[in-house]
């Protein structure tokens, strides 16, 4: 999880120089940040009512029979996913293609968000682990703040760009 101690505060709707109303969903297992991040983007693109549950998306990725992950709750369904799988879920369920991008500077983030395109950031959380968050807003200034949908957190929060930049290893821009 990306909680930053004193620099973290929860917010309903922060004033931002660029802001997208991407719905926030928490991950339903300890390792489904990738599915929850994709679900957030699909809900932004198609609406919450047209967004499948996380377990259905895992079934689709795994090629599992319907209700294997949702109904039975098979332990094989609880696994990590790749950034490619996130992009594929967004294309399949959300009808939107994605571009892979390197970590960006605040001005690129602001321009991307102002064009209506959310950004998924893959961040390092340990020596061999990563986490996926959705960047949905930025407040510019001497020390820019990002508005993040973190699937592990109960609500969106702001984080200094400089902190996220030190952890950010890969990105997806949803077209």
Task: Give the predicted meaning of each segment.
Residues 11-13:
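N-terminal signal peptide c-region/cleavage motif recognized by signal peptidases
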